Design a protein with these regions (language model features):
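Generic structural detector for well-ordered beta-strands
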Residues: 25-29, 57, 73, 85, ...
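Short Pro/Gly-enriched beta-strand edge/turn motifs at strand-loop
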Residues: 6-10, 65-70, 99-106
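Hydrophobic ligand-binding cavity/cleft-lining segments
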Residues: 1-63
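A structure-centric feature marking long, well-folded core domains of fungal metabolic enzymes
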Residues: 66-70, 123, 128-132, 143, ...
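A conserved amphipathic terminal alpha-helix motif
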Residues: 5-6, 131-133, 137-171
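Hydrophobic-ligand binding "helix-grip"
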Residues: 48, 77-129, 137-139, 168
Length: 171
């Protein structure tokens, strides 16, 4: 029997306490956590395998590869570019999952404000398999509105991101 690793959640973003939460996961054979990680942290590749992201920028310099503490911005789900900040960054290693989390914010009126934590976990599994888990908690009125849409655009969008990421890692 095995126990799987989980996302590390700051109190503010605990699943079920915000206005919108989704979780997506894939487990595939024939790839490693290192294969996936390279594609995930390189934002210059995102638009080649995920069509729900645009306008990626690094207003304080750095990039396009994400690193611990870096600030960046990107547009997604019809929102203008969100101010994002990497708050967790752990490269996958033997017996250690890769962990990447960023906060993203949209400022403005209460009707416009959005506060997000998007977390990723990338880990090697026995038998030459890799597991990729992505979860996101959103807080704010735009998040509450997004949560009521069917089909769920965030759930489907993140699944498309996972599928594209796995396809890019397999190239």
């Amino acid at each position: 029997m095995t126990t799987q690793n989980a996302i590390t959640w700051p109190e503010r973003y605990l699943p079920g306490t915000g206005d919108n939460f989704v979780s997506n996961e894939v487990v595939v054979a024939g790839l490693s956590a290192a294969d996936v990680w390279r594609r995930l942290v390189d934002t210059s590749r995102w638009e080649s395998y995920y069509d729900n992201v645009a306008d990626i920028g690094f207003p304080q310099g750095g990039g396009p590869v994400l690193t611990d503490g870096i600030h960046f911005s990107f547009g997604t789900f019809g929102f203008p570019p969100l101010d994002a900040h990497v708050v967790e960054f752990q490269v996958p290693a033997e017996d250690t999952p890769g962990r990447l989390s960023w906060t993203a914010k949209q400022h403005g009126t209460p009707e416009e404000r959005l506060d997000v934590l998007h977390a990723w976990l990338v880990e090697d599994l026995p038998g030459g398999r890799v597991r990729v888990l992505t979860q996101e908690t959103q807080i704010g009125r735009p998040a509450a509105a997004l949560a009521t849409e069917r089909p769920n655009p965030m759930l489907n969008g993140h699944q498309a991101w996972l599928d594209g990421l796995i396809g890019a890692a397999a190239e």
